[in-house]
Amino acid sequence: MCPWRAGSRDLRAALIHPHAFMTAATSSALPVLILHTGDPDDTLKSQFGGYAEQIMQAAGLTPSAVDIVAVYEGQRPQAPSSYRAALITGSPAMVSDKEPWSEDTAAWLREALEAGLPMFGVCYGHQLLAHAFGGKVGYNPAGREVGTQTVELLPTAGGDQLMAGVPTTFPAQMLHAQTVLQLPAGAAVLARSDLDEHQMIRIGRNVFSTQFHPEFGPDFIRAHLERYGRRYAAENLDVPGLSANVRATPVAAGLLRRFLETYAPGA
């Protein structure tokens, strides 16, 4: 694992000039790393697959094209040079708990940024990237964000290669209680929602993350709301209204494929 700190000179340089450490010439024959940080409950997993499987499918990848590393079970990835990109899944865990496996993964992410590896984090992965590079993560003061919600692009997304042609507003699936409260130095916010000012961020040139879930389909969200509706109702969430509003999110769903096609195309 990488021994250096989030505030080091090397990290600041990587945030500003990631191309100085690695070009886009990461071999197209290398696998995509999926950093698996947790799973849904057994019932949802049996119906829809685990989070690593869902993110693999949403990215248009096959099992032979990925290396799934269950970091939450103590597995560790190889060196960043072994991969053409890394995707970081969601998780029921909380980044603010700073579990040892999570902190070890954060150290690997700092090493990967220095190496110039393209990365895309989702939900827990979004928060872990921010935490790894000096941001602050905690419970969202606006409360839990669940269901299909509207994401709004900010002007900073206008010149971004990944977001070219993306509508200024689009629906996305949400499922989170914690959020990025404070950005890492040098990070750019690309999108927001009514309850979260940091729905999508970019770090350096080729590291992206979303609080929303590109990999979740409407059936998964409906099933989740059905299973956890009582808990959410106790938090004064309008569960029937949330369920009725669930719908397909094709723009959000396409972001993982767009990311790989743009920054880490395969053979």
Spans of model-derived segments:
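Structured helix-beta-strand junction loops
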Residues: 62, 108, 115-116, 169, ...
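Short, glycine/charged-enriched secondary-structure capping and boundary segments
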Residues: 47-50, 81-83, 100-103, 134-137, ...
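Cysteine-nucleophile active-site neighborhood
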Residues: 89-160
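Pocket-forming structural segment of enzyme catalytic cores
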Residues: 133-219
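Hydrophobic/aromatic beta-strand patches that form the interior of the parallel beta-sheet core
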Residues: 33-35, 67-69, 87, 120, ...
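N-terminal beta1-alpha1 cap of cysteine-dependent amidohydrolase-like domains
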Residues: 3-4, 10-11, 15-107, 111-115, ...
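Short glycine-/acidic-enriched loop or helix-start segments at secondary-structure transitions
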Residues: 44-45, 78, 97-98, 130-132, ...
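C-terminal and late-domain segments of enzyme folds
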Residues: 188-190, 196-202, 206-267
